[in-house]
Each structure stands twice: as structure tokens, then as C-alpha cells.
């Protein structure tokens, strides 16, 4: 009993500690220059305390639900504040706290000259808190609060530099695309309420309903919006308009993995529904390939890393599609470390080169930024799934499982091509930023010796090397069964990755001396992001607006307000007057009509007398 009390109290302490700096915003501490330090220290302590229940959970394997506040009862449905402390939430919480701790420390260096740095830290912390609410929620209502929370905080953080039009547009774009996904979430919530009369996860999972396609489609739409899957993906690269720490937090342990996490949570409903699994698998495969193609020709360092995030999210969705939610979750956890580190390395480069983001204007940075360079190389190799780095433990397993799943060879092929392309664009980043001759302004002073920068990246560097090994041993199944697959299947992931490296290196060396008169159609397709923004953001609104203008001017003004009423009345009057007053020269007829009128008048007078 004491163990259970310690478990529950330590996790509640972790979550309550995070709210302390938010509460302090009404005091003088919020105006203090040391406020960012308070926030960072709070998160570091929260991480250390969260390791207690996580360690206990790993050793005991005992799931727990804390239900400690009954909010309201609507007819037969009870709404309570309840936390689900299972395998997924207990491992995710320390990972998210560890990554955010490093990002907060990095932000103290990156945003030191910002006049509103205290507000920035408060927003980052609220972003983390809403993600924690989402992860630990045991009912759909609480999950929805966390879901909307990360949405609104992403809007505030992406549009942080609201003096720039691009930042405002990107923030609005993120909200609008997520709004489409939220429609699916609300639809699923409404369906569960009408048909199952509950929002509690346990009751939803044990209830047997014949057809769950409708709510699962809604949840898939929600995940598509939040995790930037194909169709609702353009907001993710645009979100790079926010400061680099925002990009790091947005793409590692919060927001974008929320959609994948939602599908993992509702996996018990999906595991026997083959239609939904096939849909999820195909959606993930298309996303991972399409975004990998887009990443190949981008020149903005942050955009390339953003597209790589979208590609990895597609891989996670593929994993859910082949019925492996635990592997998808493992990839979420491992991906958080190296992706946050890649963004922080790019932030270090951007900051040192006076806000230069174009990789064509970098080069030779391995001499002047040795630590950042080392971290960037390790992060890129971990992303490609290089053996025994963090990414390998999840990515290799995913490719192996897909190879032996005997379903949908088309989706598997797309995933393998995308894996190869991951190596290609990672090589491109390393080739253009770190190698060759310096192509930046020689007058720039470069300095990476700040302890805030070094320590934050160092922690994630260690995570990118060792975290995969540690997490993969504490994820189910804990004992791996004997694998019976031929060597060529076992080595597929490594082979396609090495192929991507070799091809990319060859192409990078060739492209330096290659001069094309006109860019090829494939290049245009990739650099213009598959014509998606052009069609969705330019062509379709233009067609709509021009059609509306024509309808308003032609139908309303020209026809109804002009032709139908004023012109038609005047035309009718003119026609009738012309018809009536037309002189034909029939004098006898005129006299006759005059006499008839006169006789009628006289008769009326006589009869009156």
C-alpha cells in the first residue's frame, strides 16, 4: 500500500510542480530576470521526481488510475478528473520532461535578448503542461482539454514574432489545419456519447459495438491534423517561422506526436478492424514518402528538419497500421531526443551566423563549431537509424516488422524508399553546412562556448546515443521471441539507409559542377512541395473569391438589382405605352370609340336623373 501511495503521490507532485511557475506569474517573481532560471530548475526537479514512479512502474508493471475529483454528472454520465498511469504515460512523462529541460536551458541562451523572455518561458511551460494533461488523461473530455491546449499554445508560440506577416500567417495556418482535425475528434466524442454513453477509456474499450468505423475515422482525421499527415501537412513546415526552441519543443515531445499518441491510446478499438488499419497504413506510407521527397530539395535548414519530422510521423502511423502501437510509442520516445537536438544544433548555427538559415550560405562549420558539428552528425545518424544509436532501436524494428507483416507490399515499398531518402537529406544537411569551404560572411564572430548551449545539447547528445537502448529494454514485450527471418530481410533497413548515404554523397558532389538550363519537373515537384501550397493556398482561394465576385456583381447587381426590377419595370411601361398609344390612322374607328364613350356617359347621366 505504501508503494502505491508513493507512486501516486510522486506523479501528482511532478504534475503539480509544473504549475508553480504559472501560479507565480501574479507575483513580483514574474518580473524578475531570474524567472527563466526558476522555470528551468522546476522542470529539472520534476524530471528527477518523475523517475521515481517510472522506475517503480518498470519493476512492478502495475498500471494505475487516479480518480480524485468528481466534477459533474450529466444524466447518466459522470465527468471526473482521472489520470491513467499506464505504460505509455509513465515512460512518456520523463522523456518529455528531460527533453523540455534541455530546450528551456537552450532557450535561455537563444532568447536572452528578447524583452518578453519571461512570457516566452511561461508559454513553453504551459505547452508542456497541456501535453502532460493529454498524455495522462483517462477520459475523452480531459484528453480534449489537453488536445486543444497544445493547439492554442502552438498558435501563440509559432506567432511569437507577431510583427512579421509570415509568422502570423504560419500561426493561423497551424490553427486552421488543426481545426479540421478537431472536427473529427468532436465527431468521435459525440459518437461515443450517443452510442456508448461514456467518455471513460476503460468503458469504451470493453463495450462491444458492431461498427466502429465512424468514430475511428474521426480519430484518424484528428491525428492527421495534429500529426501533419498527408492532406493536412502544410502547416508543419510553415511552423518554422517560430523561434528555434519552439520548433524543437513542437517537433520532439509535444504537439505533433499528440495525434500518433491518440491512435496509440485507441488502439484496442483498431486492432481487429482491418479496414481502419489499411487506411492508417496507406496514409502513413504516403506521408512518409511525400515529405521525404519534399525535404530533398529544401535549402532552409529548419525546413529540412521539419519535413524529416513529418516523415518520421508517417513512419509512426505506418507502425500503428501494421498493428504495433508499442513500436510506434518507442519511436516517439527515441525520436524526441535526436530531433530536439537537431533543432538545437540548427539554432546554434543560425544564431552564430546572424540568423542565416540557407544551407547554401554555410559550409566549413566543422572548424569553427566543433561541438555543434559533432552533435549534428550524431543526431543525423540517429535519425537515419545508424546501428546502436537511439534511432536504430525503434526504426530497425519497425522496418523488420513491416517486412515480416505480409500485408500491403505497396505501402512497405513506399516506406523503404522514404527510409532511403531520410539518409539522403541527412547527408545533404551535413554536406552543405559542415563540409567544404566557408560560404558565409567572414566578419561574423562565432562563439559556441556558452555553458547554457553546451550543457543543453550535451544532455540530448547522451540521450541520442544511449536512450534507445535503455527505453527499448523497458518496453513490451520485455523478452524478445526467437526471430526467424532470412539475413536479407534482417539487413533491409541498413541496406536502404547505406544506399541513401552513397547516392546522396554522389549526387551532392556531382551537383556542384552540374549546370541545368531549366530545372527538371521532379525538382520542381519537390521544391514546390508537390504543388500543394500553390493549389490549396493560392489557386483554390482565388477560384472561390473570383467566383464569389462574379456571382455578387453579375447575379446580384447586374441581374437582380438592375435587370429584374428597375429595368424590367421601365421596359414593361415602355412596351405597354407604345402598344396602347400606337396611331394606325383608322379615323372611323376613333370616331366610333369616341361616340360610344359619349353615348355611355349620356346614358349614365340620364339614368342617374
Swiss-Prot record:
Record-linked InterPro entries: NADH_DH_su5_C (IPR010934), NADHpl_OxRdtase_5_subgr (IPR018393), ND/Mrp_TM (IPR001750), NU5C-like (IPR003945), Proton_antipo_N (IPR001516)
UniProt enzyme class: translocase
Catalytic activity from the UniProt record: a ubiquinone + NADH + 5 H(+)(in) = a ubiquinol + NAD(+) + 4 H(+)(out)
Entry GO CC: mitochondrial inner membrane
One Pfam family cited in the UniProt record for this chain: Proton_antipo_N
The entry's keywords: Electron transport, Membrane, Mitochondrion, Mitochondrion inner membrane, NAD, Respiratory chain, Translocase, Transmembrane, Transmembrane helix, Transport, Ubiquinone
Superkingdom assignment: Eukaryota
Topology relative to the membrane: Multi-pass membrane protein
Regions crossing the membrane: 3-23, 46-66, 90-110, 115-135, 140-160, 174-194, 216-236, 244-264, 276-296, 304-323, 328-350, 368-388, 410-432, 460-480, 485-505, 585-605
The keyword Membrane belongs to this UniProt entry's keyword annotation: yes
Enzyme Commission number(s): 7.1.1.2
GO molecular function: NADH dehydrogenase (ubiquinone) activity
Keyword Hydrolase recorded: no
GO biological process: ATP synthesis coupled electron transport; electron transport coupled proton transport
Subcellular location per the Swiss-Prot or TrEMBL entry: Mitochondrion inner membrane
Function comment: Core subunit of the mitochondrial membrane respiratory chain NADH dehydrogenase (Complex I) that is believed to belong to the minimal assembly required for catalysis. Complex I functions in the transfer of electrons from NADH to the respiratory chain. The immediate electron acceptor for the enzyme is believed to be ubiquinone.
Membership in a protein family: Belongs to the complex I subunit 5 family.
PANTHER family named among the record's database cross-references: NADH-UBIQUINONE OXIDOREDUCTASE CHAIN 5
Name of the protein in question: NADH-ubiquinone oxidoreductase chain 5
Taxonomic lineage from the root: Eukaryota, Metazoa, Chordata, Craniata, Vertebrata
Amino acid at each position: 500500500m505504501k508503494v502505491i501511495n508513493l507512486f501516486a503521490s510522486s506523479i501528482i507532485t511532478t504534475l503539480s510542480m509544473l504549475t508553480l511557475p504559472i501560479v507565480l506569474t501574479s507575483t513580483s517573481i514574474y518580473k524578475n530576470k531570474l524567472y527563466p532560471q526558476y522555470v528551468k530548475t522546476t522542470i529539472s526537479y520534476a524530471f528527477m521526481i518523475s523517475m521515481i514512479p517510472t522506475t517503480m512502474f518498470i519493476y512492478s508493471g502495475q498500471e494505475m488510475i487516479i480518480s480524485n475529483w468528481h466534477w459533474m454528472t450529466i444524466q447518466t454520465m459522470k465527468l471526473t478528473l482521472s489520470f491513467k498511469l499506464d505504460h505509455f504515460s509513465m515512460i512518456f512523462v520523463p522523456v518529455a520532461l528531460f527533453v523540455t529541460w534541455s530546450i528551456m536551458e537552450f532557450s535561455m541562451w537563444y532568447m536572452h535578448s528578447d524583452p518578453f523572455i519571461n512570457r516566452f518561458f511561461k508559454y513553453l511551460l504551459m505547452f508542456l503542461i497541456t501535453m502532460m494533461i493529454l498524455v495522462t488523461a483517462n477520459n475523452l473530455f480531459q484528453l480534449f482539454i489537453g488536445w486543444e491546449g497544445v493547439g492554442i499554445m502552438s498558435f501563440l508560440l509559432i506567432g511569437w514574432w507577431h510583427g512579421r506577416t509570415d509568422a502570423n500567417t504560419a500561426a493561423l495556418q497551424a490553427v486552421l489545419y488543426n481545426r479540421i482535425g478537431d472536427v473529427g475528434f468532436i465527431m468521435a466524442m459525440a459518437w461515443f456519447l450517443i452510442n456508448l454513453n461514456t467518455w471513460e477509456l476503460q468503458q469504451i474499450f470493453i463495450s462491444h459495438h458492431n461498427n466502429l468505423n465512424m468514430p475511428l475515422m474521426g480519430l484518424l482525421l484528428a491525428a492527421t491534423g495534429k500529426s501533419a499527415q498527408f492532406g493536412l501537412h502544410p502547416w508543419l513546415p510553415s511552423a518554422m517561422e517560430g523561434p528555434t526552441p519552439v520548433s524543437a519543443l513542437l517537433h520532439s515531445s509535444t504537439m505533433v506526436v499528440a495525434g500518433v499518441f491518440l491512435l496509440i491510446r485507441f488502439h484496442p478499438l483498431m486492432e481487429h478492424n482491418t479496414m481502419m488499419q489499411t487506411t492508417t497504413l496507406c496514409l502513413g506510407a504516403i506521408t512518409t514518402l511525400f515529405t521525404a521527397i519534399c525535404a530533398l530539395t529544401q535549402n532552409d535548414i529548419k525546413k529540412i528538419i521539419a519535413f524529416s519530422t513529418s516523415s518520421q510521423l508517417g513512419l509512426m502511423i505506418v507502425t500503428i497500421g501494421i498493428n504495433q502501437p508499442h513500436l510506434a510509442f518507442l519511436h516517439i520516445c527515441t525520436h524526441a531526443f535526436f530531433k530536439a537536438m537537431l533543432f538545437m544544433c540548427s539554432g546554434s548555427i543560425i544564431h552564430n551566423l546572424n540568423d542565416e538559415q540557407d544551407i547554401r550560405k554555410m559550409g566549413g562549420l566543422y572548424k569553427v563549431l566543433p561541438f555543434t558539428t559533432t552533435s549534428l552528425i550524431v543526431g543525423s545518424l540517429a535519425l537515419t537509424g545508424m546501428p546502436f544509436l537511439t534511432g536504430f532501436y525503434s526504426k530497425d524494428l519497425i522496418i523488420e516488422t513491416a517486412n515480416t507483416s505480409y500485408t500491403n507490399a505497396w505501402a512497405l515499398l513506399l516506406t523503404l524508399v522514404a527510409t532511403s531518402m531520410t539518409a539522403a537529406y541527412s547527408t545533404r544537411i551535413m554536406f552543405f553546412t559542415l563540409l567544404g569551404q566557408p560560404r558565409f560572411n567572414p566578419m561574423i564572430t562565432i562563439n559556441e562556448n556558452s555553458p547554457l548551449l553546451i550543457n543543453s545539447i550535451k544532455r540530448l547528445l547522451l540521450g541520442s546515443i544511449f536512450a534507445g537502448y535503455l527505453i527499448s529494454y523497458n518496453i513490451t514485450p520485455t523478452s524478445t521471441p526467437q526471430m526467424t527471418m532470412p539475413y536479407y530481410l534482417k539487413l533491409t533497413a541498413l541496406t536502404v539507409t547505406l544506399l541513401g548515404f552513397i547516392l546522396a554523397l554522389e549526387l551532392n558532389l556531382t551537383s556542384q559542377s552540374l549546370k541545368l538550363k531549366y530545372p527538371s519537373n521532379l525538382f520542381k515537384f519537390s521544391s514546390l512541395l508537390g504543388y500543394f501550397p500553390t493549389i490549396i493556398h493560392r489557386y483554390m482561394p482565388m477560384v472561390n473569391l473570383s467566383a464569389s465576385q462574379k456571382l455578387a456583381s453579375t447575379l446580384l447587381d447586374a441581374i437582380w438589382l438592375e435587370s429584374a426590377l428597375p429595368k424590367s419595370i421601365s421596359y414593361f411601361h415602355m412596351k405597354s405605352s407604345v402598344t396602347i398609344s400606337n396611331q394606325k390612322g383608322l379615323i372611323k374607328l376613333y370616331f366610333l370609340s369616341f361616340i360610344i364613350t359619349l353615348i355611355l356617359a349620356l346614358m349614365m347621366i340620364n339614368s342617374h336623373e
